């Protein structure tokens, strides 16, 4: 279920030592607790009715609802199935399809942060098992917490917050995406600093230079499926590309995004650029083949 063994151990340790959960909150917003009190006979009861008119015990109308609301995580725990029509039989205005619950429960994957594993994930699993008889998702991917380059949690008071908009302005969104993917090791936090971003800025520069070199030699490159690779250099790079594609698919299927990014980085820079491009300078007949292979490489990136 959990894609990280470390997160799985933490989860089960918490469940084995679980504590009582106070579900009431004294807030002005939220789902009100469906418990009513009779002012005449002091009877207390829970009901599905939105606004009961009288006490079911003494029949008097002097009743009032509990002023507290449910903990936010109580209602959030129902999220996996409540928007899909569960509990809404006979509702006039439906915001769901007739088969949504059957088609989309359980879901295939939950992606969330580890800091709400117990607040949300565990409670969704409890509610799913209780009301639906099965867990609400098949896999759980806990993404990392992004910290500063020293491993400290970002805080305005510490002055170590990295504004993503500033990073986009300086480095571009693509560099940030690739950097975060490369650093997203399951079960570990990300230490993000300027050096990381510079590393992958250099990577994009490497790709640009390769593209520029190929374009200076040939105007257009056919799709890989439309040509036959014949040169020794082209065949070698095609074999390396095929191996990289297999590694990439295996990594993505396992939600190991850092390994996927590492495969792309290693192939594009160390194999294609450092070997393929350099050797093609002495083997001009392979330029067209490398151009087609490079198009496939960019698709992967």
Model-derived segments and spans:
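Structured secondary-structure scaffolds
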Residues: 2-218, 237-280, 289-299
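Intrinsic disorder at enzyme termini
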Residues: 216-226
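Short linear capping/connector segments at secondary-structure termini
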Residues: 224-229, 282
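Alpha-helical transmembrane bundle of multi-pass secondary transport proteins
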Residues: 227, 231, 235-240
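Conserved, non-catalytic sequence blocks in retroelement Pol enzymes and Pol-derived host proteins
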Residues: 285
